[in-house]
Amino acid sequence: MSIINDIKERYKSGNIVEKLIYINLAIFIFMLLISVFQDLYKGEINWFVEWFSLDDSFSSLLTKPWTIITYGFLHADFPHILLNLITLYFIGNLFIEYFTQKQLLSFYLLGTFFGGLLYLLSHNYFPLFEGSSSLLVGASAGISAIFIGVTTYIPNYQLKIRFIGFVKLWYLAAIWVGLDILGLSSETNAGGHFAHLGGALFGFLYVNQASNKELNIWNIISSLFTIKKKVSRNSKMEQYF
């Protein structure tokens, strides 16, 4: 019980980045437990994934509208969640040096939403996806919104990467987006790459166009995380990655 209490305390005292990491990890562990029991009973599809991942059809979205957000908290396997959460940790903490914690949550959720929307549009428009069906999971669209959003705001910020040295943030963002563009022709995860680009596009357009950098639409949702008031501090000019 002491471990559980320790986790609860860490969650309560953590910033929004840490809270999102804990939530994603908890859901991933829950999914693994369901998969174990599903295998024991020879089930074909994990019911949790089926109900909370985003299907590629608009008709399915009408019956399960929550999935355009909830898919952003599910992950396919351990490497998938590991890469996403490592990126979220470093980029997310950089983001809240310049924006508020509520804004980070807004970018995560809205990036997930617009990523899911582009995923649906691409699957129902491009011939590449004809005759195929898929389910979308992963936090990458929301993380892409955060990554590209903060890059648009401070493109020349320099990250210190071990064994490499200082690298401008926009170089890393260009690689991040470039890999998704190259992946659009893939027959295995093209839909996922469209979702990532949808989140990235939202992050870029919003920061590029907004005059006050404020997002208020998700204030009610963000209040559920009981985030403490952000303490003013000087922004760091380098960060280990």
Provide a role label for each language-model segment.
Residues T112-F114, L169-G178:
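Small-residue-rich segments of transmembrane alpha-helices in multi-pass membrane proteins
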